[in-house]
């Protein structure tokens, strides 16, 4: 187990009241958060989203990505379901960090795509470690998940880490002229399962 559960408190949101559970990585002290809605106990699969931190999209309303749109849609879907979990995975910029993400944005402004920009900075296309999220699910006593994601890699890694993903639930929102090339690159080069739905 790479994490420990350290704190929890109620978190009222526009979609309802969640329980915010804080975790800490044993090796680094890095914190991560789960938002739990309703009663997630029992054997029924739980609707869940693993959402990687994106300051620009989640908090600063950036149109360069679909992250903020996905965060809101996931919380809404979970509340409508009546039970579920959102894991807020503190690995900014696909785990290259905020400042390197800004550097990657600058390269994208020069014509590189999101994958090429990471490579120019010496990083893989995706540096995230989703095994931490498997530990978070286990600490919440959740073994079966209906995962809100367009990323097959998340399904594969969580499955390998012992989480039973019984269904992948698409979460396709937020496409706009500012992020269309970014989303097309994620589909073409990173295997994300996206279609050409217009902006919502």
Curated annotation (Swiss-Prot):
SUPFAM superfamilies: RibA-like. GO terms for molecular function: GTP binding; GTP cyclohydrolase II activity; zinc ion binding. This is GTP cyclohydrolase-2. Pfam families: GTP_cyclohydro2. The lineage of its organism: Bacteria, Pseudomonadati, Pseudomonadota, Gammaproteobacteria, Enterobacterales. InterPro entries: GTP_cyclohydro_II (IPR032677), RibA (IPR000926), RibA-like_sf (IPR036144). Homodimer. Binds 1 zinc ion per subunit. It is an enzyme of class 3 (hydrolase).
């Amino acid at each position: 187990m790479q994490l420990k559960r350290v704190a929890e408190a109620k978190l009222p949101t526009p979609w309802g009241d969640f329980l915010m559970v804080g975790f800490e990585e044993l090796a680094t002290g890095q914190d991560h958060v789960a938002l739990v809605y309703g009663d997630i106990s029992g054997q029924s699969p739980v609707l869940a989203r693993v959402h990687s931190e994106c300051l620009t999209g989640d908090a600063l309303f950036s149109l360069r990505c679909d992250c903020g749109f996905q965060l809101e849609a996931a919380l809404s879907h979970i509340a409508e379901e009546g039970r579920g979990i959102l894991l807020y995975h503190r690995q900014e910029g696909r785990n290259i960090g905020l400042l390197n993400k800004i550097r990657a944005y600058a390269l994208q402004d020069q014509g590189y795509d999101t994958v090429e920009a990471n490579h120019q900075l010496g990083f893989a296309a995706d540096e995230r470690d989703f095994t931490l999220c498997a530990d978070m699910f286990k600490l919440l006593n959740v073994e079966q998940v209906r995962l809100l994601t367009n990323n097959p890699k998340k399904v594969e890694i969580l499955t390998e880490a012992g989480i039973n993903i019984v269904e992948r639930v698409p979460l396709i929102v937020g496409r706009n002229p500012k992020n269309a090339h970014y989303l097309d690159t994620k589909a073409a080069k990173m295997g994300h399962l996206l279609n050409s739905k217009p902006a919502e």
